[in-house]
């Protein structure tokens, strides 16, 4: 399993977008991480379709979209259209996560799942064969700057 450097753009100033992305391009980043939120699954909002489109126009790096929202399947076509290469869903945010993951792949994008700190690996074991990426949250989702949760580290080790 490969380890990748995927800096988050959550706190990126759109005023300095081009400069910041250029710096990330030459910094050795593998993938740029974009958080999108609906204000319900988590009590916050992230980047828009237009933000992703603008980021895509300014980099050739892969873009991953972390969908912190209920029923993300409603929007995967749009995120794919606007430039996402990898689309992460939270399995508990979707009624039938297997269907959404398969739809992501049919769009030619890489499906991924997110494991929140309080979720056991056993609960997502069946989904691992359907995804190319796993995002293990070491903070509670929704806001930047939250405290690192050390108890999650064994989950990361178990995945490797």
Language model: regions and residue ranges:
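Short gly/ser/thr-rich secondary-structure transition/capping motifs
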Residues: 114-118
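Conserved N-terminal beta1-alpha1 strand-loop-helix module at the mouth
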Residues: 1-88, 93-96, 103-111, 121-131, ...
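A short, flexible beta-alpha/helix-coil linker loop
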Residues: 38-39, 139-143
């Amino acid at each position: 399993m490969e380890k990748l450097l995927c800096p988050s753009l959550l706190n990126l100033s759109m005023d300095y977008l081009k400069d910041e992305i250029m710096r990330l391009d030459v910094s050795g980043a593998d993938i740029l991480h974009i958080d999108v939120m609906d204000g319900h699954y988590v009590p916050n909002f992230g980047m828009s379709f237009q933000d992703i489109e603008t980021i895509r126009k300014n980099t050739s790096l892969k873009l991953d979209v972390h969908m912190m929202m209920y029923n993300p399947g409603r929007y995967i076509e749009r995120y794919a259209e606007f430039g996402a290469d990898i689309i992460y869903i939270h399995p508990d945010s979707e009624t039938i996560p297997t269907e959404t993951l398969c739809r992501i792949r049919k769009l030619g994008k890489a499906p991924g799942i997110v494991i929140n700190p309080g979720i056991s690996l056993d609960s997502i074991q069946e989904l691992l064969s359907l995804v190319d990426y796993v995002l293990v949250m070491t903070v509670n989702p929704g806001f930047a700057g939250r405290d690192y949760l050390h108890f999650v580290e064994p989950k990361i080790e178990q995945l490797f």
